[in-house]
């Protein structure tokens, strides 16, 4: 087939994809209206039933807590006097924390670019080693495989163990799951709470499963039960697991809202709420779902945590509306979008976008033959149709590749991710469904086959490499289609002390806009999931 025919075929595919997106958008709109109508009919009855159930639970809970205080008052007093850090009644800094020289604390904060906004002026010092914190044995034993707490863990744990609301602003791969997971599980074991008390919301199925896996590791050998709730699989199995007595639920917003509207899940006993990748959830249009979920949990007695890679106005407003004097812990300068300086960024400007596929093959051959030949490589396509085409191209060129995109079932995506993590396959092809939050260790190379729709997504893609203190390389193909992002890309490169190609400067500093030459204003619909809006 000639190059002209190929070009026409691609243009036809792109136009066809746009029509599919428009149709899907209208369908989603209609489904949303139907769901809203259904919800309004059920609201009055559910509100009354929920209030009665909530009042009854709170009354029983207060009664149990009063009995517990009567039975164990002397033990709590003794525990405090011996500097036990975590009980169900608060946190006390140990002598080991107090004995750390202030110069060492200052160096830790400076080296890791840590800032803490502490509205209640608690002035808790960071936990620099695991022997400085007293946790339940079943929890502390799971931490021995790590050398020391990560910065976000070091600084946030004291506040979280004291029951304070916390906002954590840090890059992905910073240890956020254990930052909120360790206090959550420790509190459940300490209080012997049998109710559903911990809820973690995340933007994608893959991230929800990853968090679930980490919490499962943390709870192994205990009576604490975790359940993952996400779209693309049967609701019935998930409902059954919740009703069998879950203590912790990790969920995507769309599926959880479905279960709430169906009356299949009761969140009235939640006392520890985590919003992970909050900025990403708002970008994906989950704001109303998040508000509904938060409104289904108790307003009083709830500890709320929010973790985010950036701190835009929308995230700040969410924190102001639903959090109580939160402590804000920031790792690095996250107010301004920036890339990890440990990542080498290579931007290759192409005059002809149809060169990308040939260049990708050459690049993969080069990187796979570097070192021991076992480097993990992550290739990003923009949308699922492109990913499917590139997957076929790589197979034809004898590459062993795993793939994650919207045309695959949840089982296929999970298997692909596991294959990549385990090293069975060292090449993963993904759309932006995998761009945030996923903990894929030891990714050496990220290749941006097609530049993403926003500069934020570019930075998020880069974050798949250079994790946990390691270095990485990001190779990006840039074409005239993305020239409106050239100015923002130049800023990111300069901010990370990376060279700016002369060919990129020719496009000048265009104003950023979240559109695409094919999809236009439908950019948010790119790579829609199989059966619901969460990926």
From Swiss-Prot:
PROSITE patterns per record: DEAD_ATP_HELICASE, HELICASE_ATP_BIND_1, HELICASE_CTER, Q_MOTIF
UniProt domain Helicase C-terminal: residue ranges: 362-508
Amino-acid positions noted as binding ATP in the UniProt annotation, renumbered to this chain: 170-177
Biased composition (Basic and acidic residues): 1-21, 55-72
Family that this chain belongs to: Belongs to the DEAD box helicase family. DDX5/DBP2 subfamily.
Protein name according to UniProt: ATP-dependent RNA helicase DBP3
Composition-biased stretches (Low complexity): 79-88
Top EC class, one word: hydrolase
GO biological process, one term: rRNA processing
Compositionally biased intervals (Basic residues): 35-54
Tagged with keyword Cytoplasm: no
InterPro entries linked: DEAD/DEAH_box_helicase_dom (IPR011545), Helicase_ATP-bd (IPR014001), Helicase_C-like (IPR001650), P-loop_NTPase (IPR027417), RNA-helicase_DEAD-box_CS (IPR000629)
Coiled coil residues, start to end: none
Native species: Lodderomyces elongisporus (strain ATCC 11503 / CBS 2605 / JCM 1781 / NBRC 1676 / NRRL YB-4239)
Annotated Helicase ATP-binding domain residues: 157-329
């Amino acid at each position: 087939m000639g190059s002209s025919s190929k070009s026409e075929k691609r243009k036809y595919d792109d136009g066809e994809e746009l029509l599919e997106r428009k149709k899907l958008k209208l369908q989603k709109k209609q489904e949303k209206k139907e769901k809203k109508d259904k919800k309004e009919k059920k609201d009055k009855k559910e509100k009354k039933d929920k209030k009665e159930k909530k009042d009854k639970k709170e009354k029983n809970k207060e009664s149990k807590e009063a009995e517990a205080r009567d039975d164990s008052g002397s033990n709590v007093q003794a525990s405090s006097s011996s500097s036990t850090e975590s009980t169900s009644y608060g946190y006390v800094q140990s002598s080991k924390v107090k004995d750390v020289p202030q110069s060492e604390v200052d160096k830790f904060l400076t080296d890791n670019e840590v800032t803490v906004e502490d509205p209640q002026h608690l002035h808790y010092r960071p936990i620099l080693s695991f022997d400085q914190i007293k946790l339940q044995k079943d929890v502390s034993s799971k931490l021995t495989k790590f050398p020391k707490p990560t910065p976000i863990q070091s600084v946030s744990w004291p506040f979280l163990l004291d029951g304070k609301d916390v906002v954590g602003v840090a890059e992905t791969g910073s240890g956020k799951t254990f930052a909120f997971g360790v206090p959550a599980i420790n509190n459940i074991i300490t209080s012997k709470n049998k109710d559903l008390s911990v809820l973690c919301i995340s933007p994608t199925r893959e991230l929800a499963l990853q968090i679930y896996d980490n919490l499962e590791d943390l709870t192994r050998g205990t009576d604490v039960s975790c359940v993952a709730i996400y779209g693309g699989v049967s609701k019935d199995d998930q409902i059954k697991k919740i009703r069998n007595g879950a203590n912790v639920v990790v969920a995507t917003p769309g599926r959880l809202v479905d279960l709430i509207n169906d009356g299949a899940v009761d969140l009235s006993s939640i006392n520890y709420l985590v919003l992970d990748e909050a900025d990403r959830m708002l970008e994906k249009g989950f704001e109303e779902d998040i508000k509904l979920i938060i409104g289904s949990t108790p307003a009083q007695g709830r500890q709320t945590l929010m973790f985010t890679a950036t701190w835009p106005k929308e995230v700040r407003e969410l924190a102001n509306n639903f959090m109580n004097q939160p402590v804000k812990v920031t790792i690095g300068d996250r107010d301004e979008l920036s890339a990890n300086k440990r990542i080498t960024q290579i931007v290759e400007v192409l005059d002809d976008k149809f060169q990308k596929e040939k260049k990708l093959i050459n690049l993969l051959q080069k990187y796979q033959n570097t070192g021991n030949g076992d480097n993990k490589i992550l290739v990003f396509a923009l949308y699922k149709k492109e990913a499917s085409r590139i997957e076929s191209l790589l197979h034809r060129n004898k590459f062993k590749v795993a793939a994650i995109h919207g045309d695959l079932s949840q089982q296929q995506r999970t298997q692909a991710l596991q294959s990549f993590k385990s090293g069975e396959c060292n090449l993963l092809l993904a759309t932006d469904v995998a761009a945030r939050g996923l903990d894929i260790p030891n990714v050496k190379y990220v290749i941006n086959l097609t530049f993403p729709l926003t500069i934020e997504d570019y930075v998020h893609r880069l974050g798949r490499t250079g994790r946990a203190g390691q270095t990485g390389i990001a190779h990006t193909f840039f074409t005239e289609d993305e020239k409106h992002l050239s100015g923002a890309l130049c800023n990111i490169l300069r901010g990370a002390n990376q060279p700016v190609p002369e060919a990129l400067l020719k496009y000048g500093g265009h104003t950023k806009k979240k559109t695409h030459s094919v999809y236009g204003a439908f950019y948010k619909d790119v790579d829609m999931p199989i059966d619901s809006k969460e990926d």
